[in-house]
Every structure is written in structure tokens, then in C-alpha cells.
Amino acid sequence: FLFGYDWVVIGGAKPFYEQYFGIANDPVMQGWAMSSALIGCLFGALSAGKLSDRLGRKPILILAAGLFICTAVGTGAVHSFTLFNVFRLVGGFAIGIASSLSPMYIAEIAPAHLRGRFVSINQLTVVLGILTSQIVNWQIAEPVALGATHEMIRESWNGQMGWRWMFWAMTVPAALFFVFSFILPESPRWLASSGKREAALKVFTRMGGKEYAVTELAAIEAASACQTQEGGYRQLLNPAMYKVLTIGVVMAILQQWCGINVIFNYAQELFMAAGYGVSDVLMNIVVTGITNVIFTILAMFVVDRWGRKALTLIGSFGLAVIYTFMGAAYYF
């Protein structure tokens, strides 16, 4: 949820913080403000696996929750563009950790027959976070008159305080995440792989009873016995891994290049170029978020029936058609 919220909140705040920091006519600084979180996200994703393998899943989830609180409070409180980007970097680091570790934790703690469904629900919470952020931004911002100048927006409540409350609003779900993270059990699979057999057995018993606990623990121990070497980045250089690695990397890259990030984060430019005012932009972003949630739920219901590949092809073709029409609409 917080991954989606923090990723998109900046899109609604963008028309206002750019005026406050005086970067409305500086594309380089605009790009830096938008991409600074992605740099933090890169380092968070790279470090999440190593940190969670060494310290456990639960402590790193608590760390991510604390960082989300830090970025929510700090980003809204700053008066310096440099500090704004520092806190966005911190938020990006939290996103990187959460986006990597949350699906892993869910897969490790969920019963086998519910594992796929729970991981799908994780994706649903991401898009719900996106939609919540869009609705909150829309409700916080005061109406902006058509034809309002940069100076008028900068001196307005939106330009001075509105964008800050958009970031501060994230403190509520971040604080809930932080508190409930202490209640979460540690991953029983991590406990078992770390030699804490009794602790793992206790968690599995809480989840599915004694028989389930014994069966799951035996399966983990059997898998560990068959493992001849530890996994690591060096194994990715094995020629036998090239095909799988290529598919995984290319799919991930193309997914990020599909264009939805532009729609969410640069909605201001896209909709204003189509003739909408700032207030209309914030409302239209909510419409995109609702559509996102609807089709995510639809995909959850049909993915097992249609298959992953079919849904990927349908989605890719749909995006290509939609973006073609969107691009053409600016000329007709």
C-alpha cells in the first residue's frame, strides 16, 4: 500500500511544490525531484535481500516503515529543495525495501494453498495505495482558477501548505504499518534456515496447527539438505541461467517502460496540454486510479483461467492501442 502511495503522491503535489521551489521552468530540476526517489528505490531493492537474510524479514520491514514515516514528515516540512530531494531519496529506499520484501514475506508465511492468492492481494494493495494517494491529493488541494499564474499558485494555500499536507497524509498509513510490523511474526522459513527450528515450528503451528507445522518444517529442511551451495549474484553468470535471466530482466524493463509511470507522475503536463486546468488534472488522475484498481481486480479473477502469458499479451496490446490514440488525440 505505502509503495503505491509514496510512488504517486508526488504527481499530485507536483504543480504546487514546483512553484514553491521556483523550478517550474527548470526541466532538469523537475526531473531530479521526480527521479530522486527512484535512485533510493534502486539501492533499497538491492540491499533488501542481503539485509533480510542476515537480520530477518521482520526487522527490515520495521525499518522500511520507519523510513516511510521519516519521508512523509520530512518531505512536507522542508523549505529547501536539496532537503526535499534527500527525503525523497529516503522514501525511495523504503519503497525499494518494501517492494522487494513484502511479496517475499507473504510467500514465506502464507499456507501453500493460499500463497498465490495472497501474493496477488499484495499487488492489489499497491494499486489501492495509488488510488488513495490520488484521492487524498484531490481532496486536499483547493480549487485553482483557470488561467492562474505561477505567482498566484505559489502564493496560494496550495503552493505554501497544500503540497505539504499531501506528503504528511502518508504519515497515517506509515504509522499503522510501523505499529503492526511489531505484531507480525518472523518468517518461519527464515527462522528455519537460520537454525531456529523451535521458533519456526511455533510460527507454523500458529498458522495452521501442529500437523501443518511439522509438514512445512520437514519440507523446508529437505529442501535445505538438497541445496549444494548458497545463492548469489555470481550464479546469474552461469550459462544455464542466461535464458531465464534475460526473460526476467527484459520483462521487468519493458514493464517499467510501458508508460503508466508517465501517466501517474506527469499527469500535470499531459492533461494540461490537452486543455485541462490544475483542479481538473487532479480529478482526472483519480479516474485513472479507479480504472487501475478495477482491472487489477479483474486480472486477479482471470489470471489462473487465462494464464500469465495471455494476460501479458492482452495488456501489452491494449497499451499500444491506447497510447497510439492518446498521442493522436493531441493533433486532432
Predicted regions and their residues:
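Alpha-helical transmembrane bundle of multi-pass membrane proteins
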Residues: 1-205, 222-332
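Short intracellular "coupling" helices and adjacent cytoplasmic loop segments at the cytosolic face
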Residues: 206-216
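Loop segments that connect adjacent transmembrane helices in multi-pass transporters
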Residues: 214, 221-222
